[in-house]
Swiss-Prot record:
Known role: Probable mitochondrial mRNA stabilization factor.
A family per Pfam: RsfS
Keywords from the UniProt entry: Membrane, Mitochondrion, Mitochondrion inner membrane, Transit peptide
Provenance organism: Coccidioides posadasii (strain C735)
Region listing for Disordered, in residue ranges: 39-89, 317-346
Biological process (GO), any one: mitochondrial gene expression
Keyword Cell membrane: no
Membrane topology, record value: Peripheral membrane protein
Protein name in UniProt: ATPase synthesis protein 25, mitochondrial
Range annotated as the organelle transit peptide: 1-66
Recorded GO CC terms: mitochondrial inner membrane
PANTHER family: ATPASE SYNTHESIS PROTEIN 25, MITOCHONDRIAL
Length: 725
């Protein structure tokens, strides 16, 4: 009978209901079927007898209970009660529950996300973003809505900027070319692409560049990669004026001064950059951080605030209450027509008050900074007009500071007491305070305190901080006296120095704190207002050193032996930290090239040591070869540094290459570098790294290259000792 019944049911869903009913009577659970409605082509009477069992897993006891109670059967389309649903779910074992498959997120999924549309977007913006992401293949898309900027950007009003990352320089040019062609064919626009090379032009330049590199490698000469227009890494596609979105219902048109009508169209610009160029420029940070959008109400409030501030400053200047008055400035009274004062567009001069003083107090400090000792330096324009000559430290204080500098470090730290406010706990501090009290010029005490704190910070006294040094410099700047360049450079050098407090206990590779670098940049900014040339080689050399690590480092993913000398003498750091340091180096180097800053021998020594300690060997050798092109002689000090760095690094392969290449080059330098005792010591140390058995080979009379060089160095040491005796 059951076989005939199953044969008569042709629908798969109905047959599953029949099987499910028998399993439920046998006290066996079964998951709910996927088909909730029987097939209409099977009109057999067996279907209605099992309709009450449809759509839910159940047990035999529940069916017997429902049959005995005589309750009507529930239709297939009816909903279950919460109690029945919870009771049925309790009896489903874990191995019969349907698992929802969770798709793992792709690692590249975050790079291919399309940014959300802004309010009132142009109609073509969504298609443009879809085409840039899917068809062209730009990653990490970012959309900046600059339509509410006042004043508008230089690219045009109602600007929408799209920023994307290309995979390579070739992909960058291909993507920009395809985008321009798509805009011309689809929307009949005339886009312009700055930095885009034609298809044939790009192929020709790449082919010529490869040919030059091959010829340079054949003649064993260095290939200088100049800016040939290929590796710019940045293409700006200006889509042009497009139809703008519908404005908001309550938006009001802004008044403007000029001719013509207000443009209702929008302008779209697509910035395509390589990953390195995008990290270097940081367009998102420039537009979002430094220039936040301002609404019309914010602009009106800002203009009112500026008017109140300017009127208050003018009243103080007229009444003579201003502490530091500029003799060149003149107080403007009520003769100015109020209609001519419009905040941002004003041309009146009120006690050297500038617009930056209201927008950013840290950029141009206010006059009250000298009185309140705030965190901002006093502008030279607002400083008191005192003597044009710089301050001089009295001779008694100078002798005390010289005596302090000659003491051993532990004794000097003990004599400095417990901090800048301690003036009597030690004999040195009592003598120093007595000399300050007896000084003929009290203003000279400011410079004396600055020198004392600078020496204490240099000695790494725990109670003297770099913030105390910056406060002393602010006091000197507020005094109104001239500050010499040597005093400013010494202060900056101390602020950028490494110290025990510059790193955590867990971080062995010490770096200068970001806050200390900001203090040094504030000092340089103030000195630039005084007319000092801050784009000098001394300043760039200090910034180079402060941007990196204090000790030799290596990437954590280097496959070096744990017992190797290079592993023992270098500190592992993450690749992200190394990339950050190299990015800062590249920016500093580009600024130097733009302003034609030339390094001297002292700066080149520091720069070579810096790049070698950070594992940037390509840049190290580029600077080493560049010195000959600049007609700077590589003297004895440079070769001592070269061999010493390779000996301290402990890399056998690099030490061998250095010896074979640059020991013969010493005799070809102009003037020649002779193998004396100083160079012989570092060359022998480098030989022990390249070949640890070189001494035994030399004693055994081995005629090899390394044993002969060892004997030459040994003879140079013996000759030097003979001359000294």
């Amino acid at each position: 009978m059951h076989r005939l019944m199953l044969r008569g049911i042709q629908c798969y869903g109905c047959r599953s209901h029949v099987i499910q009913s028998f399993l439920a009577i046998a006290d066996i659970t079964f998951p709910a079927p996927r088909y909730h409605k029987p097939c209409p082509r099977s009109p057999l009477h067996h279907q209605s007898s099992f309709s009450s069992l449809h759509g839910q897993p159940f047990r035999g006891q529940s069916i017997a209970r429902s049959a005995s109670s005589g309750e009507p059967s529930v239709d297939n389309g009816s909903e279950q009660s919460p109690d029945a649903a919870s009771q049925s779910n309790e009896h489903v074992p874990w191995y019969l529950k349907e698992e929802t498959a969770e798709l793992a997120s792709h690692p590249l999924g975050q790079q291919q996300l399309i940014p959300p549309l802004p309010d009132n977007p142009p109609p073509m913006l969504e298609d443009l973003l879809q085409h840039i992401s899917v068809d062209i293949g730009l990653d990490d898309l970012s959309l900046l809505d600059l339509r509410n900027r006042n004043p508008p950007p230089a690219l045009g009003a109602n600007l929408i900027m799209i920023i994307g990352t290309a995979r390579s320089v070739k992909h960058l040019n291909v993507a920009a070319d395809r985008l321009c062609r798509w805009l011309r064919s689809t929307y009949k626009l005339q886009p312009t692409a700055d930095g885009l090379l034609g298809r044939n032009e790009l192929k020709i330049k790449l082919r010529r560049k490869a040919r030059r590199a091959k010829l340079s490698s054949n003649v064993s000469s260095s290939f200088e990669e100049k800016d040939d227009g290929i590796t710019t890494g940045w293409i700006c596609v200006n889509v042009g004026s497009v139809e703008n979105g519908k404005p908001a219902a309550g938006a009001q048109k802004r008044d403007f001064a000029g001719f013509g009508n207000v443009a209702d169209s929008a302008r779209i610009v697509v910035q395509m950059l390589t990953e390195e160029k995008r990290a270097e420029l940081d367009l998102e940070g420039l537009w979002n951080g430094n220039f936040p959008p301002r609404s019309p109400s914010e602009l009106r409030a800002f203009e009112q605030q500026f008017e109140q501030f300017a009127e208050k400053a003018a009243a103080e200047a007229t009444s003579g209450r201003g502490m530091y008055r500029d003799s060149r400035s003149h107080a403007t009274g009520s003769g100015i027509d109020p209609g001519q004062r419009r905040g941002l567009h004003t041309s009146r001069r009120v006690q050297s008050i500038s617009i930056e003083a209201v927008l950013s107090p840290g950029m141009v400090p206010r006059q009250e900074a000298a009185l309140n000792h705030e965190d901002h330096l006093v502008s030279p324009r607002n400083a008191p007009a005192k003597a044009s000559k710089p301050l001089n430290v009295p001779p008694e204080i100078t002798s005390l500071l010289q005596h302090l500098a000659q003491l051993p470090r532990d004794d000097a730290l003990r004599e400095l007491g417990s901090g800048p406010r301690d003036m009597g706990s030690t004999l040195f501090l009592r003598l120093f305070q007595q000399a300050l009290d007896n000084a003929e010029d009290p203003d000279g005490n400011i410079l004396a305190k600055l020198e004392l704190i600078r020496i204490a910070v240099t000695l790494q006294h725990p109670q003297y901080t770099k913030a105390d040094l910056f406060d002393a410099f602010k006091e000197l700047a507020a005094s109104g006296y001239d500050i010499s360049e040597s005093q400013a450079l010494q202060t900056v050098k101390t602020l950028l120095s490494f110290g025990d407090n510059d790193a955590d206990v867990s971080n062995v590779a010490k770096r200068v704190l970001r806050s200390d670098i900001d203090l040094a940049l504030k000092v340089l900014n103030h000195m630039s207002l005084r007319g000092m040339d801050i784009l000098s080689r001394e300043v760039f050399s200090m910034l180079y050193t402060a941007s990196g690590f204090q000790v030799p480092v290596r990437p954590t993913n280097d496959n070096l032996s744990p017992s190797s000398v290079e592993t023992e003498k270098s500190t592992p750091v993450s690749a992200e930290e190394l990339n950050e340091v190299r990015l800062v180096q590249d920016r500093l180097r580009k600024i130097m090239d733009a302003f034609d800053v030339k390094f001297g021998p002292e700066q080149f020594l520091s720069l070579l040591r810096f790049h070698f300690h950070h594992g940037n060997y390509d840049q190290f050798w580029a600077i080493w070869r560049k010195m000959s092109l600049l007609q700077l002689p590589r003297s004895k000090e440079f070769y001592v540094l070269l061999f010493r760095l390779h000996a301290e690094r402990g890399n056998q392969k690099r030490a061998a290459e250095c010896l074979s290449s640059w020991v013969p080059m010493m005799a070809r330098e102009q003037p020649p570098v002779h193998l004396d005792a100083d160079i012989a010591r570092v060359v022998m140390a480098c030989l022990l790294v390249a070949n640890p058995d070189v001494k035994q080979r030399a004693d055994a009379g081995d005629p090899g290259e390394y044993p002969n060089l060892w004997n030459r160095c040994w003879n140079a040491l013996v000759a030097s000792q003979t001359v000294q005796e």
